[in-house]
Amino acid sequence: MLAEMLWPAVNMLLPRKALLVDIFFILAATNLMIAAFALGCLAFYKQLVYITIGNLTFPHQSGDEVIRAMYIPPVNDSVDFNPGFRLSWLNTLSPLSDGPYDSWSQCEICPGRFVGQKACYYVPPKTYSFQNCFFACKNISKCFYLYTPQNITDPFFDHTLRDQDIWIGTFFKKLNAALSTIDNNFDYTAWDELSVYCAYLTRRSRSTVYFTDCTTSKLCLCGQEDFTPAPFYEALTPAPVHG
């Protein structure tokens, strides 16, 4: 008798309980969708503002921004960026105003193979690591140093970069530092930043590019500026390459 009296009330509660369960699952599913959407947006944002090279991640910056310091997480001793140890040789390099390069009278005549608009260039036939290019250029002539070109539209680069990339004398001496060159003279507004200490020119792009492995062998751009070219060396200027 009691069961018969309570059964209508139970029947009235069952739909309400089912409705509450449905609402709970709907809310839970909605929250999951919102969370998934937020994570997707975050991943897309990181894809836009970060670039990953191997297991190193670097903030991506537009080319015309001023170079900012970047943190590189340690990987292992063989590839870790440790300017205090591995780049100590860069800290010993002196600018031209403090060095022996511009004190040699014979530097007034270009001893190199090619003469550009203002610079005298020489490219050793062998390839070297970025570090060894500094010494290769110095060993060829007291006039030469690993050079950073001011005019990469010079026909010389059409001739030289046809086959290979070439190291140039642009580098970081340490983290949290500005770019440096031996002659303290460069005027670039666009760079590819990979937060490494070496830079090169490539046949694929007229922009200067940073390279992740500075021990790789490439050609070296040895050069000097502010000289008086002799007629013999002027005749060696390469003709523009078309096509």
UniProtKB/Swiss-Prot annotation:
Q: Which GO terms describe its cellular component?
A: host cell membrane; membrane
| Membrane topology classification | Single-pass membrane protein
Q: Which domain of life is it from?
A: Viruses
Predominant cellular place of this UniProt entry's protein? host cell
Q: Which UniProt keywords apply?
A: Disulfide bond, Host membrane, Membrane, Transmembrane, Transmembrane helix
Disulphide bridges: 137-222, 198-214
Query: Which SUPFAM superfamilies does the record match to this protein?
Result: C-type lectin-like (SSF56436)
What compartments host this protein?
Answer: Host membrane
In Pfam terms, one family for this protein is Lectin_C
Protein name, as recorded: Putative C-type lectin protein A7
Q: Which organism is it from?
A: Alcelaphine herpesvirus 1 (strain C500)
Q: What would be the name of the gene that encodes this protein?
A: A7
